[in-house]
Every structure is written in C-alpha cells, then in structure tokens.
C-alpha cells in the first residue's frame, strides 16, 4: 500500500454507487460495554445476523480486537473472514475507507480524518485514535493504495449515484465540530477532489435526534440513478415531519450531475421508538462516552439499509411498518432479494445496518 499525494479526481478515480457491483463488504465487531448493553452480547448476535445475510451474496470480512478474536471466530459463519483489527467501536461505515475505482480495473481508498462525530465538541467518545487507523489497516489488507483526505468526515455523511452526484446534509458537514476552518464551497471542493463528483445536493438536517449529527444515510440515499429513497412520516406533531418535508422539496427541485430531475420515494419511518429502562440498565457508564438513558428516542430509519450484490439487507423494527418498507424496497430493487434483519440492538448503539457496513466495489474489468 502506498499513501498517495494526489487526489482521486486527478488520477481518474471515482466513488461508485452502492448499487454497483461489489467485491465484498467490511464490518467491525462490537464489544465496548459503555455503548452496547450486556457486554455487547445482544449486539453481537445482531451483527452476526447482518454478516450472514450479506455473506449470501458477497464476501464479508469482520475486524475484531485481539481480546474478542476467538469469540468472534466461534460465533460468525465460516464463510465470513475474521481479521484482527483494533478499533474504538464498531462503525465501519464511518471510520473505514471509502473505496474509489477507475476504468482500468484498479481500486484505491480514501481515508477521511475521523473524530468520533465531533471530537471534544459534541463527539460520542474519547479517545478515537484506533478508529482513525482502521481505514489505513483495511486498505493495507486489501492491497489498495491510500489517499489521506484533509477533511474530517465519516462515510455515513455521503451518498453518491456513481454518476457525479453526492447527497449530504448541512447539519453534518457544515457543523463547526467537523471542519470549522472550511466554508461550504471549500467542503464541496474537497468532495469533488476525493469522490470525483461534480454536483453536491445539500439537504438541511438528518433524521431527528441522530447522534452522529445528521448523517445522510439515515435520511436519504440513491437507489438507482435519478431515484432517491427518503425517510418519511405523515405525523405533523413529529419533529421529523418538517425535516422530511424540507428534504423532499429540496430533492424535488434539484437536478443531478447529468441534469435529471430526481424521483423521490418515501420510506415511512416506524412509530417513534425509545430506549427502555431495562435496556439502559445494561449499559455501563464510562467517562468520555455518550450517556444512554431510559426514554431516549432512537433514530430509527428504514433508509439505513445495505445494498449487496444480490440482496438488500434492511432493518426490522415493528411488523406493520416493516412490511410496508419491505414492499417499497422490493419495488425499488426488483432484481435483488430484500432480506430483513431484526436490528434493535444495533439501533440502541446509535446506528443501523448501513452504519456498520462498508462495501468494496468491484472495478470495471476486474
């Protein structure tokens, strides 16, 4: 692995859409007791179910600490690769690399600067030094050259269509706890350089009470060129109502990089979900970590799914809303099997399926 001084844009590399072909998927293993209840055992079961669902259509690798290596190897399916990688938590989407490809069969990776969603100004834990090393270690294992981007950002803050368009939110990427020295125009320029996009569509806020600070992957994502899935609610009393309405209007009036209008598909969120007293009691309190309390509203969204080669793996919350969301996703992905996985235990930790996965795209001609 080489660390390159150029940029993907300059070298002819781009970030492909998640719905393009993959070579595989990376995840991390949960274990910290101040974020995952009951010593992370319930969360580990959910991660295992997600890994198994994805492994039915593409290779899956899971990074695990030395202390948890034998436990993870014993629990995960045999067709899932287990690799020792130190990390501070288990959010591969955010601390892992963003892979980019060119038209000559080559793949490289972008290593963003990670500060645990805000550093000492609203971040979720300290320290985060091992997380900031994860992307480089994954790229080393994948034999992919590395671009170290001068931008504090997480993979969940962006969604691309693979044809020059990027979705993000002002709440996240313009937050002073990420890049206070950069203007909106300068942030856009960095996205152009490292993703090879030519159009950035800015939505205002992410999902209500998303503790990452407004990640796009809870709110909206591309399902195919010109098509966007959007978290939705018809409940005017829910703060999410105005957020989704504003996002809908921005998307409906936007053009993508190729000049197309966007078709927006509403994915109704589940009824508001809250952390129970029993769940909160199972989480240890540690200094420097985001507290989790009974009654906290959980940022539940059906948009936080993973698009695999042959499958879409979606979170399950409650039967009625689950069924409606699955019907919508089957319509949006007619050539893929839609598989639901119960992931409340992941949600309790602050994210969901998309947050714990990172696709490895297959370069053209490979």
Residue ranges and their predicted role:
Residues 1-366:
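Histidine/cysteine-enriched polar flanking segments
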């Amino acid at each position: 692995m080489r660390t390159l001084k150029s940029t993907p844009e300059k070298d002819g590399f781009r970030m492909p859409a998640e719905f393009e072909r993959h070579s595989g998927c990376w995840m991390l293993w949960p274990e910290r007791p101040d974020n995952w209840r009951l010593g992370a055992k319930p969360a580990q079961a959910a991660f295992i179910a997600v890994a198994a669902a994805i492994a039915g259509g593409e290779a899956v690798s899971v990074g695990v600490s030395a202390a948890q290596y034998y436990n993870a190897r014993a629990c995960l399916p045999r067709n899932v690769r287990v690799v020792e990688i130190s990390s501070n938590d288990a959010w591969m989407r955010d601390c892992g690399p963003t892979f980019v490809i060119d038209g000559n069969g080559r793949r490289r990776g972008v290593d963003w600067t990670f500060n645990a969603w805000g550093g000492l100004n609203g971040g979720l834990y300290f320290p985060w030094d091992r997380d900031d090393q994860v992307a480089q270690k994954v790229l080393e294992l994948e034999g992919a050259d590395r671009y170290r981007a001068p931008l504090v950002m997480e993979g969940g803050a962006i969604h691309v269509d693979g044809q020059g368009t990027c979705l993000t939110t002002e709440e996240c990427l313009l937050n002073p706890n990420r890049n206070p020295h950069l203007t909106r125009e300068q942030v856009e320029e960095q996205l152009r350089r490292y993703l090879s996009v030519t159009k950035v569509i800015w939505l205002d806020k992410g999902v209500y009470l998303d503790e990452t600070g407004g990640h796009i992957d809870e709110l909206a994502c591309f399902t195919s060129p010109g098509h966007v899935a959007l978290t939705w609610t018809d409940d005017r009393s829910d703060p999410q109502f105005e957020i989704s309405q504003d996002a809908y209007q921005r998307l409906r009036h936007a053009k993508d990089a190729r000049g197309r209008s966007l078709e927006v598909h509403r994915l109704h969120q589940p009824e508001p979900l809250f952390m129970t007293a029993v769940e909160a009691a199972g989480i240890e309190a540690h200094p420097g970590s985001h507290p989790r309390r009974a009654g906290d509203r959980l940022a539940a969204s059906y948009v936080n799914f993973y698009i695999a080669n042959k499958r879409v793996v979606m979170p399950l919350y409650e039967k009625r809303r689950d069924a409606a969301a699955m019907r919508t996703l089957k319509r949006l992905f007619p050539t893929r099997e839609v598989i639901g996985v119960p992931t409340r235990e992941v949600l309790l930790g602050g994210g969901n399926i998309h947050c714990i996965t990172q696709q490895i795209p297959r370069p053209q001609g490979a």
